[in-house]
Amino acid sequence: MSTHLEADVVIVGSGVAGALVAWRLAEAKLNVLILEAGPRIDRLEAFKSYVAAREKNFNAPYPPVPHAPTARLNAWNDYYINTGPNLFRGTYTRAVGGSTWHWAGSALRYRPNDFRMKSSFGVGIDWPLGYDELAPFYDEAERALGVAGSKTEDWGAPRQSDYPIPPIPPTYLDRVVGDVLGPLGMSLAVFPQARNSVDYDERPQCCGSASCVPLCPIGAKYDASVHVLKAERAGARLEPNAVVHRIETDANHRISMVHFLRPDGSTGSAAGRIVVLAANAIETPKLLLMSRDERTSKGVANSSSSVGHYLMGQIDQGTRGLTKAPIYPYRGPVLTSAIREFRDGPFRSKHSGIGTSLSNEGWGHARGPQATALKLIDQALRGKPLQDAIAWVTERQLVVGSTAEPLPDSANRIVPDDTKHDAIGIPRPRIHYRIDDYAKAGLTLAMRRHEAIFSALQATEVETFPMVTSSGTVLGTTRMGDDRRQSVVDRDLRAHDHSNLFIVGGMVFPTAGVNPPTLTIAALALRASAQIKQDLAQMP
């Protein structure tokens, strides 16, 4: 059985980028179709899955979806085929709302220098647009997501408007750690975050569950299902469980159709005057490269041979310890404050900028209260002594984490592996990734700062974790640029090769930065929406 669907705009993917584009275009009374590979998520059922799960990791609320698989914690190669010197751990959720279901909610803008790495520091590459051009869309994105913050906190990105809602207050943990930072040449500031400090946009105020990763149980933290629903209310049509596997072009180099599979074995196709790919930085290049035919021998949108290259994941490293005095983690959102310094400066010509933040979730899922209890039980503690010992340890648990930016490297790439397929016969992604010396040098300096912080807190049981690619960021692979010989999309996110194809999401980033990328993804999507409306208005 096969179905054929038509719309003004066909959007593949319903994460934050696809959802915002769908919302903006549906509000403009355009006929919008959203094709999402995964299912809808019911928040209550997800919460029940999390409670019932033995391991409380970020996969716990979201059972595997055989027809739309992803890499999962501690089982990265069940889907990815990693072939490089470093394990690529960037993951995502294939479901309505995408990975924003389990993001931390941190919503910083990129800094002006993040858009001009080559011009400012002689490394990487410049973006085809600058901060000033994106600033109005940052304002719009903050209103759309409901970003809580304070204009008085300087995060290095000039702004004219205030945040739409007041900042999330710092935790007691933030205040204790912040008190020791001054003599170390550091200062703490409250993060802007897409989490309600007050009721906003029909969503409740944060109640401090400390479970933002993997799930906000009440919907106070923004996730993209918010704008999928708004798009549907404005007339958009959502087709969940529709796995797009091929893009078809016509003789005029326009996208004529996309083809999809369903888990029941049925097939479908969809045609739109404009097609928008918003399926993240792994699935999007995989789809483009799988769509080779006699007209596009290297794949769709790939005349530059750049599709799949320049894969980036921010690089993480953390330190844990037990502070001398109680700091009472496990209260409030998972992250509320971060260190201002070391994110930008002339040093970026030699090593990465560093984003350092404090975690409010103790030692996390693997080493938190449950693991502490098991360890103490093995030491023959029972009853009140066991209870007191668990409390003593958990109220002192601290993790400080730092993030480094890699430089874009053509050798870091993703391709479809034609020899290994998923449950419905689609090639799995084969990934080559290497952590570069630029990021390593930045994190080496960051670990010295971690040591100083834990020393000032008179901490014990201090341990530094290995350097790893972030599980929360997947960037590059269809990067934007003015030169069509070295990029896939232009400054408006329109494919150089196909006038009616737009690509939105982190895959268009030329460089990674150290700030969380979600707000920049949102701003770029809103900017592209305006261009799509203009293009449609000019079409016959």
Where are these regions (language model features)?
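A short, basic/flexible loop-to-alpha-helix module at the beginning of a structural domain
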Residues: 1-6
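N-terminal Rossmann-like FAD-binding beta1-loop-alpha1 element of flavoenzymes
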Residues: 9-34
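Glycine-rich loop(s) and the adjacent beta-strand/alpha-helix scaffold that form part
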Residues: 27, 31-53, 233, 242, ...
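Conserved N-terminal glycine-rich FAD pyrophosphate-binding loop of Rossmann-like flavoproteins
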Residues: 39-65, 93-102
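Conserved redox-cofactor binding core of oxidoreductases
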Residues: 58-73, 79-85, 94, 109, ...
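A glycine-rich dinucleotide-binding beta-alpha-beta segment and adjacent secondary-structure elements
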Residues: 76, 189-215, 219, 245-248, ...
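FAD cofactor-binding and catalytic pocket of flavoenzymes
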Residues: 76-92, 96-99, 103, 127-131, ...
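A conserved FAD-binding loop/helix module that cradles the flavin
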Residues: 511-530
